[in-house]
Structure formats: structure tokens, C-alpha cells
């Protein structure tokens, strides 16, 4: 299976690091690609129950605007834990610890530079999208306001093969704190979810909290404009369909 193959390959990598004698000062950073199995890859439901539990408790999978299409775990660990190691004392990752901090791939850049002993990665002209998440990794008290208070934006203005239902239509979404808003370009509709209370995104709160939705929508639109994001194109009208 793919899991067995991945496990064997990761084991080969760790054994090679050990054979080089550098496992004491080597960090293993492991993460998945975005989301779980796509709609096409999922095929039949587990044990043919008729219930899609591949991503449970998350909704949908890779390519979808819902959490099953974006949320994945991130694991950071020393290749070999050496008690009393001076190198590892500089980054004392608690064993078996779990953080609920909201991270994105760009956060790895400033974090890894810090772990490697880099002094600075900024210049007068540089713009760094990521945030150093070392404190979250070390288990410092949450919430980490810099991580969890910022807006995370996901933008997919393209058509998924076959245009299946389930959030695979062209979309943009934003998460800030506990809240997540999604905009679907084809139908020009918004959805709003409180992820802490509803991780499965089963209850759309867009009608119940219009003020919250409006603030998230304005933030999302401005961030997309600031970054020059491409919009979906109406094939017949041959014009952009910007976020409404």
C-alpha cells in the first residue's frame, strides 16, 4: 500500500541520516500535500458502507474548499533523541506534544532558518509571508495570537475535472481565528463556518452572522487584489469574474 511504501521510504531516510552520524542534529519535518484523497481517488466508500469517511471528521478531500481539501498534519521531530544533547537543548521539542496552532507552508521558511541558527532573513525590500512558529512547536502556552489571529487565504479559481459537487468548483476562502468563509464563483454564493464548534462544516452560518461574513469577505477580497490574484474567466462573455 501507499502507507507501507511511505513508511519504508521514510525509514530508509532516517537510517541513512543515522549512518552518516548526523541524526543528533538533524530535524525531520513531515507534512502531507494539501488535503486527503480527492473525489476521484476516493472511489468506493470504506467497506462499501456508502458513507464517505476517508477524511472524517473533515468534509470532502483534495481540491475541495472544505477542510478535507486543505487541512493536513505537520510533524517536526529530531531524527534521534539524544538525552543531554547540547544541540537538542537549543530546540527542546516536547515528546508526544500536540499543537492546534494554524500553520501554512510558508511558515516553514522563517522557522527552519531560526532552527538552523540563522540570525536574520529579512531585508529592507523583502516581504516574508510566513510566520516563525517555534514557540508553538516548543509547547509554549496557547493561543499564539500571531499565528491564530492572522488571515489565511486559499484561492483556487480553476475548474476541477468534471466539476463534481462538494466544494470543487472555483472558489476562494479565508480563515481567521475560529471562522472560515468560502466564496464559490460559479453561483456567486458565500458560506460561513465556525470551525471550533463545527469542524465538519455542516452548518452554514452566513445568514446568522452577516456582519462576520462581511468583514471576512472584505479582508479576502483585499488580499486577493493586493497580490494580483487571477480571477475565473467566463468563457462565453470572455471576462473576469471577480469576487463579489
Predicted regions and their residues:
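Non-transmembrane alpha-helical segments in soluble domains
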Residues: 7-14, 18, 109-113, 134, ...
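Surface-exposed patches in mature extracellular/periplasmic domains of secreted proteins
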Residues: 24-25, 120-125, 232
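Catalytic nucleophile-loop/oxyanion-hole region of alpha/beta-hydrolase
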Residues: 1-5, 102
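Beta-strand elements within well-structured catalytic alpha/beta cores of enzymes
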Residues: 3, 10, 27-32, 74-75, ...
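Metal-dependent active-site segment of extracytoplasmic phospho-/sulfohydrolases and closely related
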Residues: 5-42
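Long, internal low-complexity/basic segments
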Residues: 108, 164-167, 186-189, 195-244
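C-terminal cap/loop subdomain of S1 sulfatases and analogous C-terminal strand-loop tails that border
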Residues: 36-65, 82-97, 101, 105-195, ...
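Loop/turn elements at helix/coil->beta-strand transitions in domains of secreted/extracellular proteins
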Residues: 22-28, 70-72, 148-149, 177-179
Amino acid at each position: 500500500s501507499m502507507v507501507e511504501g511511505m513508511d519504508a521510504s521514510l525509514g530508509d531516510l532516517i537510517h541513512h541520516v543515522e549512518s552518516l552520524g548526523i541524526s543528533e542534529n538533524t530535524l525531520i519535518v513531515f507534512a502531507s500535500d494539501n488535503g486527503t484523497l480527492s473525489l476521484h481517488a476516493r472511489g468506493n466508500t470504506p467497506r462499501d458502507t456508502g458513507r464517505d469517511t476517508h477524511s472524517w471528521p473533515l468534509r470532502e478531500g483534495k481540491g475541495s474548499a472544505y477542510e478535507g481539501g486543505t487541512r493536513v498534519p505537520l510533524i517536526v521531530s529530531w531524527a534521534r533523541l539524544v538525552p543531554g544533547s547540547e544541540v537538542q537543548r537549543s530546540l527542546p521539542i516536547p515528546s508526544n506534544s500536540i499543537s492546534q496552532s494554524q500553520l501554512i507552508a510558508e511558515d516553514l521558511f522563517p522557522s527552519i532558518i531560526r532552527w538552523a541558527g540563522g540570525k536574520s532573513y529579512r531585508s529592507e525590500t523583502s516581504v516574508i509571508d510566513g510566520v516563525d512558529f517555534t514557540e508553538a512547536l516548543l509547547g509554549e502556552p496557547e493561543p499564539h495570537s500571531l499565528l491564530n489571529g492572522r488571515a489565511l487565504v486559499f484561492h483556487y479559481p480553476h475548474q476541477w475535472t468534471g466539476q463534481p459537487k462538494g466544494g470543487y468548483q472555483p472558489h476562494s476562502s479565508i480563515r481567521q481565528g475560529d471562522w472560515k468563509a468560502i466564496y464559490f464563483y460559479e453561483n456567486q454564493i458565500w458560506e460561513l463556518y465556525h470551525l471550533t464548534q463545527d469542524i465538519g462544516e455542516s452548518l452554514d452560518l452566513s445568514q446568522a452572522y452577516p456582519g462576520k461574513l462581511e468583514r471576512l469577505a472584505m479582508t479576502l477580497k483585499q488580499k486577493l487584489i493586493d497580490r494580483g490574484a487571477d480571477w475565473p474567466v467566463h468563457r462565453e462573455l470572455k471576462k473576469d469574474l471577480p469576487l463579489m
